[in-house]
Amino acid sequence: MQMFITRLAAAAALACSSAAFAAISADEAKALGTTLTPIGAEVAANKDGTIPAYGGGLTTPPAGFKAGDGIRPNPYAGEKPRLTIDAKNMGQNAAQLTEGTKALLQKYPSFRVDVYPTHRSVAFPKWVADNTAKNATKAKTLNDGRSIEGAQAGFPFPIPKTGYEAMWNHLVRFNGQSYEAKYRNLNVDASGRTALATEGVSNQEFPYWDPSKASDTYWRIKLTYTGPARRAGEALMIVDPIDMGTKDRRAWTYLPGQRRVKVAPDLAHDTPNPGTAGATTFDDTFIFNGSMDRFDFKLVGKKEMIVPYNDYAAVYQSKQDDLLKPNHLNPDLVRWELHRVWIVEATLREGKRHVYSKRTFYLDEDSWAALASDEYDARGQLYRTGFAYMAPSYDLPAPYTDMFGHYDLVSRLYSLTGFIAETGGLKHTKPLADREWTADALAGSGVR
């Protein structure tokens, strides 16, 4: 498959400097809402018709959906795969598979990829489109791409020119302004044994998406652990600034045994994530999360790739024991589709430290969410591979990719983060009061 490099993506080859990158011109922005969707995806179908033209996404809930319920029925439940890929026929489809997907097909005979008809189901409220159009000609990156300015309540860079701009679209991706879920994080070891890493309640907010007021915070999360028993009562809070070039992530933990809140500056980058019992790094969260200061991010281009998509069966309808199987998730429950993705390569900066020397990210053109990643070790060998399981909230509407997982190709362990099918699903909520995002409030949230 030929890589589709746009003339804008070609600009990513230019060396980065500390100077600000300029916003796009008004003439360039005219493509939004015409040949491009309001957030920057190609409207047209692909040449073969295997990717349809964008028609506005899915905004009507299917039969069986109950307003206010956290569980969302599968609107495509009756469909059958149009193609099944396994190790035997992988070569015929290799150009549309990530390196991680190919590695899993080669490593595990039971792993397969069931490719279903493509549905461009992602949709957004009109105000997201309107604000994205405003941002397009004003938003800029600063501090080697690690900060942004001139953007609010819309995607900052619908027509990206650099890898940093594309990754900012992912970092601020719209899942709704605020939401809550009871979740489980689970690990499956090389022997096939499933272990609970953590479970609890997650409250997430994106103050960036508040159209009524500007904020210097783009994302914040509060986790209250209810299990396993030895972790019950612990709590964690993270607040990420829009200006990550000059400001650090703020993070706190509460340990009930000590009965005090501690500042936790190390909850970032390649620190092992206690939420997954160390199976992933902190910046593996949501495929990528946090500051971009450890890597150089290059926008490679756009390509048609087979990625997890419309995974309502796995995210909302599955049972834990049915979904988690030895070596990998149950292929019967994972839906893959052909979509256009932006490819961003991240290379470790000289003088910086990280367990990964290189990373490749695959960003969905319709949502800007990272749907897959490949992570390489210090020797340049493929080490881990990650996938996010898109299941849009058609009732809002908004994308949703907070169930994600990583496969460790060395230890043969894999993790699944954000399993919500048996714990009430995802509920969109009103933002918490600012006082709930303080250290004192974190201490009060931890209960045993």
Predicted features and spans:
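Short, surface-exposed, charge-dense and proline/glycine-enriched linear segments
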Residues: N74-R82, W209-S215, R294-V300, M403-I420, ...
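Extended beta-strand-rich segments in extracellular/periplasmic secretory proteins, especially
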Residues: M167, N175-N187, T194-G227, R231, ...
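Gram-negative bacterial Sec-dependent N-terminal signal peptides
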Residues: M1-A22
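Gly/Pro-enriched, hydrophobic low-complexity segments
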Residues: A23-I24, A29-G56, T98, K222-M292, ...
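Generic serine detector
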Residues: S17-S18, S25, S110, S121, ...
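Long, C-terminal catalytic modules of enzymes
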Residues: E422-R448
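Phenylalanine-focused residue identity feature
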Residues: F4, F21, F65, F111, ...
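Solvent-exposed N-terminal domain segments of exported/luminal and surface proteins
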Residues: A26-D248, L255
